Amino acid sequence: HCADLHLDSPMETHMTEEQASTRNTEIIHSFLRLTEYAAKNDVRAVILAGDMFDGERVKVRTIDEILDAVRRTPNVDYLYLAGNHDDTTYAFADHDIPTNLKLFSKEWATYEYDGVVISGIEICEANAHSLYLNIPHKNGVINIVTLHGQVGSSSDVDEINLSLLKNKGINYLALGHIHTYSEQPLDSEGIYCYSGCLEGRGFDECGPKGFVLLTVESGHLEHEFVPFSCRQLHRIPVDISSLTKNSEISQKMKAAAQGIPSEDMVEFLLSGGVDPTANLAVSYLQNLVKSDFFFVKVK
């Protein structure tokens, strides 16, 4: 279960063109690595819970890479549910869709595997209320439902009415839209889970990113978050009260970031009262530490 790749989306505005290009390529390659992981570990199906793309920004070569990776792993099904940022009509125009790429639509669709059924629907204005009236369910198997949106208490295009999904026999509700992994009880039978994104893109997406591995054995479902990103993003608060020199501040920044791998991305958040005579220079501080990590931002 993964979601929210946002392929070819704009990167952090303060990145260099080269850094932004590198990150876009890495995000695409994270999905390619995911397909290899799935094939190697005998994963039967990958749930893509929305926002794989980012509107019409997606490049033809990106679509080609994604579809080629799907074709290279024919024993894995990819169950793709479009999200609010997706435009599948545009993305897949003039492309042959591999048989193992299964697309959900604005009507409920269900895919059956050994002891598991996976159902999903793309929420729109026409079905935002009615979709809760006929949620698919099959007795004697694990029932997984996938949706894209923000959980809440209303039924809307952008909001999933959690109360109307309770006590419907759902064992696992696979969600997309929130870019951080989280899980909560749905009812006595199941949980709802946001897988988060595969790779963080901005400093509002810090921490481990990856996917959720679901294992079903003897009618029992287990789930595990698998960190998978090639880089992490970090926000590091640094109290610079009483410091008067840029060199002192940079040393405190380095100490605060100790232990963070050099390939990661770091945003330093400076706080505290500074003497007006200190001649604090944010751009200079950024230059002092930028070689320590893939990307550095100082605020």
Map each language-model feature to its residues.
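Accessory, non-catalytic peripheral segments of nucleic-acid enzymes
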Residues: 218-299
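Amphipathic, non-transmembrane alpha-helical secondary structure
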Residues: 28, 32-39, 64-67, 132-134, ...
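His/Asp/Glu-rich metal-coordinating catalytic cores
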Residues: 18, 45, 54-193, 197-210, ...
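N-terminal active-site segment of His-dependent metallophosphoesterases
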Residues: 1-65
